[in-house]
Every structure is written in C-alpha cells, then in structure tokens.
C-alpha cells in the first residue's frame, strides 16, 4: 500500500486506486487507521494531515506528500522504499528497460566488454551507489533516486553454470516482468544502510550473524562490528580432496577479473576487521587497472597505495614501477597487502611460461612472509598457482570467481600463520580445490555459536532459521538476549509444518507464540522498517519465504499505537467480505454464532468478540506487522502508551471469545497453523490476565424496566446484567463501581424485538444495546479483582416465563430503565438506584 497525499483532487483515473478525504470529525490516528484498511494498492489522500502521514510511515506504510502531477505519476507507477526521516525516496522501478538499457551501481562492470553480450541494441548504464546518480532525473519536492539495477542478475550469472550471458539475461528479465517484485530484497540494502549507523551510535558492541555478499559494501564503514559467517576454507581442509588435473573452464563471457580482485581485497579487509577492529591502509602490488577501487571508495574512505608499471587511476598513491623486496620496508603497520603479480604469457612456450609462473609464486609467497614478519597488525592476500608447495595449515584458501578456471588461487595469511606448522600440498590437490571450490562469500569469519551475549547487540537477519541450527537454541537466544534484532522464518503454512524447504536447504518455521519474551516487539519486515525511519509501498506476501522481525530491548516497546501497531488489521477482512463472502457482515455473524450468541440484530454494531484479535489470528499471514502478543500484554499490565485514536479497551473475556471464534474458523478452513496459533494465544491471554469466573455466583446485578412489551408470568421481569461471586465485605466495592457507572448505565439505548426459548422451559426476550457497557463494567470489576461474569458468553435477555411459549416478533422497541440493583441470589437486594 502507498498513500500519496494531495491538497486537491486530480482529474486522472488510475487503476487499483482509491480516494480518501481527511475526516475532520476524527483525529489523526483514526484517519490513519481508516486509510490503512482500504483495499486498493494506491490511496490518494486529499486534504491530508501531516500527523496522519507520520503515523502511517511509522507503521511502515509509505505515505508521501505530493506537490506535482509528475511526482504523482512517478510514484503511482512503481514501488519504493521511503526514508521518511530524511525525505528520500528509493524507487524500485525497472521501466528503464524501455530505454533498451540495463543498469549497474558497480563501476568496474562498465570497464568490461559486457556490452558485446547484451541484447541487440541495448546498453549498460552506471547509476552510482543505490542509484544516487539518478537523482538528477527527478526535480521533485523530495529527494528521489531509482535504486533498481541489474547487479543481482549479473552477480547471479557470475556464480551460475551458464556461459551464454545474453540468453541468461533474457530469461531473467522475462522472469522479472512476470513475477511479483521481491520488494524485501530490493529495499533491504536501504534498510541495512539505515540500520547499522543508527545501531552504532547507540551500541558499544554489535555482533552481526550471517552476512552475505549483498552486505559487503555496507559493513566497510563498521570495522568494530564483529561478523560471524561459515568460516574459511583452510589449507588443512584439502586433506579431504583427491588429486585432479588442470581443467581450463570458461566461467564468464565477459572479463570478471576485476570482480575477483575486488572480492579478494574485501575478503582481506573483513578478515583484518575481525582481528583488529579498525581500518587498514591497503597496499596493492600488481594493481593495474583496479577500476573497482572507485566502487569501494563510493562506500567508504580507504587509503590505497599501489605499485604497477601501468596506471591505477583510482589509487590514493600510485607508484608506476615494479615492486621489489626492498619496498617491503616502506609498508607500515596496520595494513593489508594484496600481491597480484603475474607475468603475461604473451608468445612464451607454455612449459617455459609455467616455470616462470612457479618461480613467481615462490617469490610472491616470500614477499608475503617478509611483509608479515616485519611488523604488527598485518594481513596479506597473495596470488598462487597450483604447484607442489609447503603451506601453513592454518592459511586460508580463496577462490572467488574469475573469467576462467585455470591454475590460479589466492592465499590469505596473518602473522600467526607464518609461524604455524606447514604441510606439503601436492599440485593435484590444489587443482582439485580450484576445480571444485568457489569462495561464495567475502565474510569468512567463524560460525556463530548460539548463545546470549550480555552486553552486546546481536543482529541476525535471515541467518538462524536454517535447520542445521538447533531450533530450541534459537528460541532460547531470542528469549534471553537482552538487545537484538533477529529474524526467523514465519510459519505461514496451512498444515503447521515445522520446517519448509528453501533452495537446497530447510528452514525451521516459527510463530510469535513460540517465544517467551518481554520488552520485545515481534513484527514483519515493513513493521520493522517503520521503527528505523523507513516505510515501504508494498507489504510482504502472505505466502512464501517471509520472516518475523524480533526486536529485543527497543525503546519503542511501550509506544503501542506508533510502532508495530494495528494499522491494516482489517484490510484482508475488507478485501474478502466486500468481494468473496456471503455478506459484508460475515465476520460479525460468524463470531457471534461460533460463541452461541444467536441474536444477530445489530451484530455489526454490538460486538461481543474482539475483532482485532480475531482478525490478527485468522489473517495473521497478512497482518503480522501487528504485534498481537505485545498488544495483549501491555493491556494486561495497564502500560499501553496510547497517543491518540478512537480507543476501545477490550475486556479480557472478549479476547477469549475471539480465540474461540478463530479456532472454529481454522477448523472449518482446515488451517492447522491458525488452530495452533489461536490455542496458544488463548493460553497466553489466560497467563497474563488473572481471569476468574462466577460460574457458581452468589450475587447478580439486575435491571428493571418501566414497561415490558410482552406477556410474562414471572414476578419481576428483569435483565440480569452480570453475575458475581463475592464476599459480603466486597459489596461496598461493587456498589462504588455501579455508582461510578450510573450515568452510562441509565443512558444505555436498550431495545428488544423478539422472544425465544433460551432452553426448555425458559422463555425469554432478547435485549440489544447493552454489551459495550457490560464489557466496560467487566473491566472495572476485573481491575478491582472482583469476580464478575461467567465462562460462557453473556447473552443479554429478560426471562418472561418458565413455560414453553411460541416466539413473538415485534417492531424494535426501546426499553426505559426503571432501576438498577445489586441482589443476593435467593436473597435480598443490597443496593438499588433509580434514575
């Protein structure tokens, strides 16, 4: 959903668009709630309130002020992520395909021959970091840039088994045009760039679990963040390999040597961060042309000092000469060294050239050892070739993708490796490594052992659901870690599957009720965005690979109506009931009938079941941005921080009724997941509320009326307005509450319209118009620890006779209250009040 705010209406008609005019009779929160439950994707919001826009954005729903038709046209035709704090819109708009172009935000790609392999007549355009160079295309009242690129497809091609780039891109673009937008992946980069600067300002130590290459630029600015990944491939791990020969396989049609070098250096930087938690100076030997340095500098400020007879245009300091052993002394501490020296073969005989390469490899390794031995805080990455070698068993082997698989690999060394045990590695084993192993991640830090860290902030985005992690350990971590942002895969199956397939692995699935947490927000991706100053125009799909975002220790926890709130709670219900259902009242009717309340007159107005809880349960796949458990808990301890809106406080019994309805709904739909979820929420309600029932009552509150429009043979026909189980010493407390509610009780709009047999031998008249007041009184009694109401649903009625009689229907008739009293069952009246 996207909300586009206008001061005046527009003449154009847009598909999937609805107009909402601000209602001045309602406050900003109520307007935001009503907007969020509209069913179209685009909302044109007229006569808007700035506060309402703020509320929507904090809820994760993109809401933007529009000043021109051009702005409106741009935003209505595509999806976007909105930084509502800095007023920046990141479009996810692939309409540039109509210009016969693909886009990249990696400069090195533009220096390759990739355009020779594009679709006929197509070109490649560089658009800068997150599309920053496209800002000049939009002369808008807000900052706007198109963050959509084809880098994901280019990188996927590099790691694929496919060689034909043109056919690969054609297939992927067609897929992109025929499937839904992977909005979370597109906006995740914006989210990470917002998240980690905010966390770093507030937190001393941050642990980040499971980063992938998509994050490799983001973390360059955060050397102190401790990363956990899948660990490195060590020299000693080659013991598992069988010897092989030279393969000579082409990986990419266009030259990706630049990519390989960039990945090697970034891997080395993160390895250095893990050891020393600070930025190094980057020395590079055999550097030309290293166009990728431009990309790294777009994200983070590094000093590059380079040596090569050819130019290295983006180096901070370039020495246009060969590097020699005597230059080692010039290299300072707190640095990394990347050695990428190799003589071009030219016309040299391959046997002669092989001798040169092997000699160069030995020389390179000697340079690396000398560099590491000469100072402190150093890491080296050195180019190697497959040959018989003695190598430190703890050295790290790297083999990032390059244009052709030949005999080249890289060795990552630290100062401890050079003094470690060395092992003889045959050439055939190194060929086996080169032929079969691709380094898929620049993060090669050790794996995370699932345990809590008392003083650290843990971030684990899409990292802990895999079934090689123990599910109980993951739950315990979330329950006990004081400060964290952790995602787990939501159980949106219908058969309550404990795990589901994802690519070539399996993920555990989770529901919010799997966790026993306090001071925690459990929400969706869009709900989480709102907490960190972002909003999004397209919410997560109800099915597929979606995640719960779990925030421990957030200062937003008590701000119940601002973050992870109830906006959009009825949207799915509205979509169904106004399109597919038997009547738009289907939900109301079902909730009453499933609780044995058969008086459906005014069912859409006089509710006995919490619609919030009911919708949050049966449609949780659509509205899990609403943190239901937090909502229940904060109400139970009376610490819900409500800033505004039309606020109705539910009685705890209304929540129980909602669970009962949801369970019956789930049974009819054969939805085992909702069935379990509703059962667990009901248990949670009973846990946090101390609900007691007057199933064996000794007092009741009665209401007598001036006139009953039916024949009756009981002595005093009355409405039993609830029963109580109290000691005589509690009577003054009950009377006090009755007196405090005097005006509301006498002002009830009580009506009746028919009679019926409540049970065999009990003939009654229906009563409408009292439930809202009943539940308000229930709440007051509950807070005073007075047992009021029974476990079965309260069905308001007036007993007319204890004989069987036929049903009588009359015009709806108002009943005028004569008196309201408290009376002991089979005893005397102890309190009476008249109007």
Swiss-Prot record:
PROSITE patterns: SAM_MT56_VP3. Residues 246-428 are annotated as: 2'-O-methyltransferase activity. Signal peptide: none annotated. It comes from Rotavirus A (strain RVA/Human/Japan/AU-1/1982/G3P3[9]) (RV-A). The lineage of its organism: Viruses, Riboviria, Orthornavirae, Duplornaviricota, Resentoviricetes. Residues 556-692 are annotated as: GTase/RTPase activity. Interacts with VP1. Interacts with VP2. This is Protein VP3. Contains a bipartite N7-methyltransferase domain, a 2'-O-methyltransferase domain and a GTase/RTPase domain. The C-terminus contains a phosphodiesterase domain that degrades the 5'-triphosphorylated, 2'-5' linked adenylate oligomers produced by the host cell in response to IFN stimulation. Pfam families: Rotavirus_VP3 (PF06929). Its EC number is 3.1.4.-, 2.7.7.50, 2.1.1.56. Residues 693-835 are annotated as: 2'-5'-phosphodiesterase activity.
């Amino acid at each position: 959903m996207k909300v586009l705010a206008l001061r005046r209406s527009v003449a154009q008609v847009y598909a999937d668009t609805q107009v909402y005019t601000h209602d001045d009779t309602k406050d900003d929160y109520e307007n935001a709630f009503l907007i969020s439950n509209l069913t179209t994707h685009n909302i044109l919001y007229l006569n808007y309130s700035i506060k309402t826009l703020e509320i929507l954005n904090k809820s994760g729903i993109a809401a933007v002020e529009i000043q021109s038709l051009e702005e409106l046209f741009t935003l209505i035709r595509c999806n976007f992520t909105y930084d509502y704090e800095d007023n920046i819109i990141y479009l996810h708009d692939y309409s540039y395909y109509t210009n016969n172009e693909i886009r990249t935000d990696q400069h090195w790609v533009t220096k390759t021959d990739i355009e020779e392999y594009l679709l006929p007549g197509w070109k490649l355009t560089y658009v800068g970091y997150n599309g920053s160079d496209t800002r000049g295309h939009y002369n808008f009242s807000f900052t706007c840039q198109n963050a959509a690129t084809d880098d994901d497809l280019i990188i996927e091609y590099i790691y694929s088994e496919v060689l034909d780039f043109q056919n690969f891109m054609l297939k992927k673009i067609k897929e992109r045009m025929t499937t839904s937008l992977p909005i979370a992946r597109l906006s995740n980069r914006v989210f990470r760039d917002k998240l980690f600067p905010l966390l770093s300002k507030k937190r001393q130590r941050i642990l980040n679990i499971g980063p992938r290459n998509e994050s490799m630029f983001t973390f360059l600015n955060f050397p102190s963040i401790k990363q956990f990944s899948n660990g490195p491939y060590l020299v000693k791990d080659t013991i598992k390999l069988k010897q092989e020969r030279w393969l000579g396989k082409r990986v990419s049609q266009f030259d990706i040597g630049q990519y390989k070098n960039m990945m090697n250096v970034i891997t080395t930087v993160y390895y250095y961060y893990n050891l020393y938690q600070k930025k190094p100076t980057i020395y590079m030997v055999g550097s030309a042309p290293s166009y990728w340095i431009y990309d790294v500098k777009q994200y983070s400020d590094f000093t590059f000092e380079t040596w090569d007879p050819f130019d290295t245009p983006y180096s901070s300091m370039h020495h246009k000469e060969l590097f020699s052993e005597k230059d080692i002394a010039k290299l300072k501490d707190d640095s990394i060294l990347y050695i990428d020296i190799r003589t071009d073969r030219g016309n040299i005989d391959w046997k002669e050239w092989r001798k040169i390469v092997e000699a160069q490899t030995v020389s390179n390794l000697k340079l690396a050892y000398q560099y590491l031995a000469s100072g402190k805080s150093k890491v080296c990455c050195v180019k190697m070739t497959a040959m018989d070698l003695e190598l430190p068993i703890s050295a790290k082997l790297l083999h990032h993708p390059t244009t052709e698989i030949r005999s080249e690999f890289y060795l990552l060394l630290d100062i401890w490796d050079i003094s470690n045990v060395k092992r003889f590695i045959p050439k055939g084993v190194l060929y086996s490594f080169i032929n079969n192993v691709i380094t898929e991640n620049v993060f090669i830090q050790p794996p995370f052992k699932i345990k809590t860290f008392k003083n650290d902030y843990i971030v684990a985005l899409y990292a802990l659901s895999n079934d090689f992690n123990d599910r109980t350990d993951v739950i315990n971590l979330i329950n006990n870690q004081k400060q964290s942002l952790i995602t787990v895969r939501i159980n949106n199956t219908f058969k309550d599957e404990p795990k589901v397939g994802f690519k070539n692995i399996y993920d555990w699935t989770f529901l919010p009720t799997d966790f026993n947490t306090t001071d925690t927000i459990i929400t969706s991706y869009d709900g989480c965005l709102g907490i960190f100053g972002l909003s999004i125009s397209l919410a997560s799909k109800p099915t597929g690979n979606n995640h719960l975002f779990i925030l421990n220790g957030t200062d937003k926890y008590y701000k119940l109506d601002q973050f992870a709130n109830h906006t959009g709670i009825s949207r799915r219900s509205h979509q169904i009931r106004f399109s597919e259902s038997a009547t738009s009242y289907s939900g109301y009717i079902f909730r009453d009938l499933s609780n044995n309340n058969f008086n459906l007159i005014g069912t859409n107005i006089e509710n006995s079941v919490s619609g919030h809880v009911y919708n949050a349960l049966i449609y949780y796949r659509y509205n899990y941005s609403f943190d239901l458990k937090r909502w229940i808990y904060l109400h139970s301890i009376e610490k819900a921080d409500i800033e505004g809106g039309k606020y109705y406080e539910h009685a705890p019994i209304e929540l129980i009724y909602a669970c009962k309805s949801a369970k019956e709904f789930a049974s009819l739909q054969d939805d085992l997941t909702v069935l379990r979820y509703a059962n667990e929420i009901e248990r949670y309600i009973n846990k946090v509320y101390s609900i007691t029932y007057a199933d064996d009552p000794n007092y009741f509150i009665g209401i007598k009326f001036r006139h009953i429009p039916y024949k009756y043979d009981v002595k005093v026909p009355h409405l039993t307005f609830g029963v109580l189980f109290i000691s005589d010493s509690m009577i003054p407390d009950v009377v006090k509450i009755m007196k405090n509610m005097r005006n509301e009780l006498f002002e009830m709009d009580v009506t009746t319209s028919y009679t019926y047999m409540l049970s065999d031998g009990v003939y009654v008249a229906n009563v409408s118009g009292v439930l809202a007041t009943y539940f308000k009184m229930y709440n007051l009694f509950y807070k005073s620890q007075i047992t009021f109401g029974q476990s079965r649903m309260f069905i308001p009625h007036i007993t007319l006779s204890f004989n069987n009689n036929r049903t009588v229907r009359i015009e709806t008739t108002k009943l005028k209250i004569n008196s309201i009293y408290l009376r002991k069952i089979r005893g005397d009246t102890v309190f009476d009040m008249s109007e």
